[in-house]
Amino acid sequence: MISKDHLHHLDPLGTTKSYHMNTSTVSPPSPASSISLSQSAWLEVRLFYVRIAPCVVENVPDFLTLRHPRRETGASLEVNGVRVPSSQTASLKLRRDRVDRESSEVTYVSTETVRVTGCVDFEVYDNEDMVLCGNLDRIEGAWNNGTVSDPKTGWGMDCYIAMGNGHVSGPSASVFFQPKFGVSSPSVEVYIAGCCGGVPVILTKTIQASPRRKVARHVTLDAIPEDEEVGKEQDIGTIGDELARQSKVQMMESEVDEYDDSDMKMAQRYYPEGMYVDEDGQLSWFNAGVRVGVGIGLGMCLGVGIGVGLLMRSYQATTSNLRRRFL
């Protein structure tokens, strides 16, 4: 046992302070409170439901695949009580539950128990074609930007229509997005039911697939030469050629309606005068007639001019002869 004098000898200025904790006043957390705190952070999903309408019910698959891709640090995932490492992808089956031929809709359901914490993404596939994607996350009410959330627990869901093979762009080969079957913009409803800390949680969202929009078309016309100096007959021929020439219009479009696969098309347009152009590009009989008519007109003008000149010359000669006689 150390005496007070010995302590004073070790610290004569009395700078050493001793702290005493009354352990009788601090009680350890009860097991029930620790369990409730840990369970309140988990969202337990007991039902995952997807409804798609309209669709071609004769071609819909028997199963869809629900995937939870790799997650970031801090996000946990359990499937039927088994922890899934964050570096691995979990896959579940969505079985076809109901098909309504009158309303052309189909429903897929999964009743596997899935528990998540943090932000966990999910993806729904038809074979290798993504149908939709989204995420589950616990968010604050102030940051709710279009996300469906539960006001009591704070858990929210956001989802989007996926139009391509594992991507959110490009045409999809899924049977749910096939314009040739008359289905290009179906409505997809996602429904999740579960609980968080003993509080029931229901999240549902309906998303509508819309046809892709066209972008502005860039039109380029061929330049018309203006600085060439030619003769009168060549000018007349050039005018006729310019009236009959065709204009190539290049349409640059990155997206087309009904998920068309082509991104660039070349089309040829004609001026109204182009109807007088044959398939081989030569002048038609109409333009040839115009040329002949212009030539005839010029010939007539030249003939009249020559005739008037000869008449004037003969008149002058006659006048001079008469003057000589009278003089």
Curated annotation (Swiss-Prot):
GO terms for cellular component: membrane. Its main location: membrane. It is found in: Membrane. It is a multi-pass membrane protein. The chain crosses the membrane at residues 183-203, 292-312. Keywords: Membrane, Transmembrane, Transmembrane helix. The keyword Oxidoreductase does not apply. Disulfide bonds: none annotated. The keyword Membrane applies. Residues 12-31 are annotated as: Disordered. PANTHER family: NADP-SPECIFIC GLUTAMATE DEHYDROGENASE (PTHR37244:SF1). This is Uncharacterized protein At1g01500. It comes from Arabidopsis thaliana (Mouse-ear cress).
